[in-house]
């Protein structure tokens, strides 16, 4: 986590992109969509499939697009802290 991030105030959605066998999928485009499926942000997953977004409490869809396939997962953080989610692509 970057220095200066106050996890008592910040809502962080973090996780990994994995394939059907649970192996990391690096280089995937990971998008954060709000509750009405509107695009909010995009990052590229690290070589180990890791990604991170700073968001507000609410319902979010995390969508991963990769050469190994695509996948979605919904996460609904209710407050500050780290909220971990894995996105499985197929």
Curated annotation (Swiss-Prot):
InterPro entries: CarboxyPept-like_regulatory (IPR008969), DUF1416 (IPR010814). There is a cross-link at residue 88 (Isoglutamyl lysine isopeptide (Lys-Gln) (interchain with Q-Cter in protein Pup)). Keywords: Isopeptide bond, Ubl conjugation. It holds the Pfam family DUF1416. Gene3D superfamilies: Carboxypeptidase-like, regulatory domain (2.60.40.1120). The keyword Ubl conjugation applies. This is Uncharacterized protein MSMEG_5790/MSMEI_5637. It comes from Mycolicibacterium smegmatis (strain ATCC 700084 / mc(2)155).
